[in-house]
């Protein structure tokens, strides 16, 4: 089959004008080609033709491979022009070469015109130098002609990638400028090599003429533009006897920038395994498989072991072989563990929330926090203390109490009961008890809690008593209503402050006073479980605050205040009994009920 090579690209700048060149089509037929190129030394009116190929290769009956040669002129060197031809017959018909033709076979610097038995330099160029054959001057070594100086080729870039021509047009244009003009008409439009089909019966190759018409205009490919091969040039792909290039012209020829953008790098690929990835997960573009693997590993705090050298390949096919190396690569590419939601924050779309195995405040830390919050919410703040009734100078306490003093005593007790009830409801686990046990625990521990909380808030050194409502009274102001009981409360307050009890420890101690075993409980087991949890919380806190050698002694001294507290509770019941006997003011129903319920014990 005949094979014609045509290469397109940005030609180098010509040193002279080229607007007089003609653009006649070039006819290609299946036969031996002759070249109707005039010699620079012949007369302009009668251009002579070049010798036929049969003259050069007389006696050779094989096939001609693709060749690339340079034609030197007599006045200036010519660059190489790219052509190709093949012959299927060994006919000896050849065109007659005039005597004035100055071309000899020795003057051709052959780059790729060898019989079929020789290895073609074109194949070597394609395999060694890549795109240099198509996009830049041929750099492969070639046989040299004696006494012939090759033209110096200046490097220039080809804009059409693999279809860029060699830079042999420059010398060819300069050489053809000396040819006579074929016509006096206007210059032809910019065109590439054009090959016209035969108009008649197919003659022999010796009868078909080969005419070269370089483009007069410079065609450059702008950045970001892409061109496809024109449909008017079918079969003009660079070919080789050993290569199949029938589908080259079917695909568009794009610029270097567009080709590099199409091949895309790693965009759209998983950074871990290279699979398809649509978006970013945990800070890195990953596939759904690696996203789920990373999330499960972080949520479960999974630990993996590599059975190899901790350098296992992680790709789409082998990503499940070593979980250790896969997780390490997830971290190496930048996936962030802190972004993964924990179990408590996981979305539960489409599912009913499962019942927790234990209450959310089951841990000692959460329980201690809840106890501290309940204690702070039930007490008055320092900014809201009421000093409106506070008096340091009062009459001596000798004499009998009046109704006003008794009423004040009852009001302080009943007011404290409401605050203590609200505080107890905020203790984790208390409201889960049955209502009967809740009331029993409150009524049994009411006086103890009243004394303990009053002693902790008061300032015994200044003689100030701070009640739960924020009311501040002096010790002498409470002497007639409370009697000797108030002196014992202040003494207990001094001993409690001497221990240096902090708020967390006091919050746990107050809860233990309320949550304890009482006679008549309906569900004592649940009360005991809640008591053990609070005791463990207090023990852990004391161990943290006091240190290793001190926690046992500090805890025992703190719990040693509970018997003193029960003694003070008994004294308070006795005071209520005395005031009830005097019958100056009837006691409130809740106080009377508490008193009557404790008499039987």
Swiss-Prot record:
Tissue specificity note: Expressed in testis, thymus, brain, and heart, and at lower levels in ovaries and spleen.
Zinc finger (NR C4-type) in chain: 270-290, 306-330
Record region (Required for nuclear import): 173-469
Keyword set includes Cell cycle: no
In-chain residues carrying the UniProt-annotated modification Phosphoserine: 344, 354
Localization in the cell: Nucleus; Cytoplasm, Cytosol; Mitochondrion
Main localisation: nucleus
GO cellular component terms given for this protein: chromatin; cytosol; fibrillar center; mitochondrion; nuclear membrane; nuclear speck; nucleus; transcription regulator complex
MF terms in GO: DNA binding; DNA-binding transcription activator activity, RNA polymerase II-specific; double-stranded DNA binding; identical protein binding; lipopolysaccharide binding; nuclear receptor activity; sequence-specific DNA binding; sequence-specific double-stranded DNA binding
Region Disordered: start-end pairs: 1-21, 180-205, 238-268, 345-364
Region (AF-2): 587-598
Sequence segments annotated as region (Required for the interaction with RXRA): 302-364
Post-translational modification: Phosphorylated at Ser-354 by RPS6KA1 and RPS6KA3 in response to mitogenic or stress stimuli.
Co-factor note (free text): Binds 2 zinc ions.
One Pfam family cited in the UniProt record for this chain: zf-C4
Induction of its expression: By serum growth factors and during liver regeneration.
Family: Belongs to the nuclear hormone receptor family. NR4 subfamily.
UniProt note: domains: The NR LBD domain binds the lipid A moiety of lipopolysaccharide (LPS) in the cytosol.
Protein role: Orphan nuclear receptor. Binds the NGFI-B response element (NBRE) 5'-AAAGGTCA-3'. Binds 9-cis-retinoic acid outside of its ligand-binding (NR LBD) domain. Participates in energy homeostasis by sequestrating the kinase STK11 in the nucleus, thereby attenuating cytoplasmic AMPK activation. Regulates the inflammatory response in macrophages by regulating metabolic adaptations during inflammation, including repressing the transcription of genes involved in the citric acid cycle (TCA). Inhibits NF-kappa-B signaling by binding to low-affinity NF-kappa-B binding sites, such as at the IL2 promoter.
Record-given protein name: Nuclear receptor subfamily 4 group A member 1
Organism lineage string: Eukaryota, Metazoa, Chordata, Craniata, Vertebrata
